[in-house]
Amino acid sequence: MRSDVIKKGYTRAPHRSLLRATGLKDEDFSKPFIGVANSFIEIIPGHFFLNKYAEILKDEIRKNGCVPFEFNTIGVDDGIAMGHGGMLYSLPSREIIANSIETVMNAHALDALVCMPNCDKIVPGMVMGALRVNVPTIFVSGGPMRKGYTKSGQPIDLATAFEAVGKFETKEISEEELKEIECNACPSGGSCSGMFTANSMNTLCEAMGIALSGNGTILALTKEREELIRRAGRRICEIALDERFKIRNILNEKAVRNALVVDMAMGGSSNTVLHMLAISREAGVNLQISQLNKISQNIAHIAKISPSLPNVHMEDIGRAGGMNAVIKEISRRDNGMLHLENLTVSGETLGERVGLSEIKDESVIHKVENAYSKVGGLAILFGNLAEQGCVIKTAGIVGERKFSGKAVCFNSQDEAIAGISSGKVGKGDVVVIRYEGPRGGPGMQEMLSPTSLIMGRGLGADVALITDGRFSGATRGLSIGHISPEAAEGGMIGLLRDGDIIDIDVDTYSINVRLSEAETLKRKAEFKPVQKELKGKWLRQYQRLVTNASNGAILEA
């Protein structure tokens, strides 16, 4: 056992003495030691109950002959951090979480690991940390939130609440209606109910084989979720000493491909591109952002979930057959994109796991023949505005897929929010938000507030938004993020001026600004990047080490 280094032999008497102080007995030193990486935090709706779930998990681990040791990671709620300086810390928190797991697991030589994330950057951060440790690992999240309803019975969620702000500003809804949405959009604990970043990543954990079936769709705070946690506790004890289930043996190149295939089929959050690039690098997989379009071109988009389809939520996907039904349906298009032979933590191959699964509601999960689109729900655009690529969630486009318009430039998200609210942006404009990339922000803020204001003001089909920052999974519209190179590193987005004509064509994967070579060279010679005053020491450290979005915004070693 890996843990023998802290518990076997006479030289480890001091170590055992310390472990006895935690309650261990003689018989425990012959058992596998299991790390339980929890992310309990009271301010996050998807996490405030994870302390109770961890107790259920640890109890099951003890019953099955192993010794659990719970530790905690930090967490940031992107929704609460949205639209102010707190969002600067969201993406950097991913690295702290990864470092935390690497530190605790390796410092104490634990044999196996169960990760209990749920929201936003916590899932990818834990995956990255687990890959560094490389022991048998199971992911079991806290589960998605129920959707909310208005008094009239209309389904709503967090995206509704953000867009309601713009509607209130334009007097489309009253203060009373805004309050009704506020009080009903998030009716229970869990990860926000749409196909936002948290639920996107939790479903991809199923596709990668590192979580048990149902991880992405079984609702939080239900008996079914508690049983899933018990199953994870039993299973980790079965595989704790089996090298076949080291996470790098499960999350390999084929698993990365499977995750991206499922992501395209479901129109996941654009953040998944950033996180899968980072995860692939930790897994030793050479994934390039340019490869994603080939996957998208071969995968039908068969499930639309809020915000792309506001009435459909994760509980509906679960009711319609869950991820197994989605994966089974994708596999019917026999084009070699899915690797059904890949092993999962349950001991089954992915193909065996989905088995005889079938769609129970074709209005929620479509057949391939009746797909929303013959191509996937995400795309990577290239051009003189994004030589290293940028990302758009095509599943969320509400207007035309081809757009040309005049640039309206802002050097921060705060400037953009003020400009949109004051009416500076009109039909036919391309909103440019720059100096919000991984290094320029720093921290690559999510632009849900600006995009929600655009939608709420009725401009969703008539305005495009481009940024070197990123978007919440709740964003919809012609919103293009992750532009690389970013403004802070001299990218073309930093050279744009108000009135420049920008051409976007999603179907040809292109994004360009109409500038002559002479004008471009002139602007480059005159370019001086905006320098922001940073008060946080961690943000200054992060800014020095972070790479751009085309590399997953990972830190340089």
UniProtKB/Swiss-Prot annotation:
[2Fe-2S] cluster binds at residues 119, 192. Its cofactor is [2Fe-2S] cluster; Mg(2+). The active site is at residue 472. The modification N6-carboxylysine is found at residue 121. Binds 1 [2Fe-2S] cluster per subunit. This cluster acts as a Lewis acid cofactor. It is an enzyme of class 4 (lyase). Its EC number is 4.2.1.9. It catalyses: (2R)-2,3-dihydroxy-3-methylbutanoate = 3-methyl-2-oxobutanoate + H2O; (2R,3R)-2,3-dihydroxy-3-methylpentanoate = (S)-3-methyl-2-oxopentanoate + H2O. The keyword Repressor does not apply. PROSITE patterns: ILVD_EDD_1, ILVD_EDD_2. The keyword S-adenosyl-L-methionine does not apply. Pathway: Amino-acid biosynthesis; L-isoleucine biosynthesis; L-isoleucine from 2-oxobutanoate: step 3/4; Amino-acid biosynthesis; L-valine biosynthesis; L-valine from pyruvate: step 3/4. Functions in the biosynthesis of branched-chain amino acids. Catalyzes the dehydration of (2R,3R)-2,3-dihydroxy-3-methylpentanoate (2,3-dihydroxy-3-methylvalerate) into 2-oxo-3-methylpentanoate (2-oxo-3-methylvalerate) and of (2R)-2,3-dihydroxy-3-methylbutanoate (2,3-dihydroxyisovalerate) into 2-oxo-3-methylbutanoate (2-oxoisovalerate), the penultimate precursor to L-isoleucine and L-valine, respectively. Belongs to the IlvD/Edd family. This is Dihydroxy-acid dehydratase.
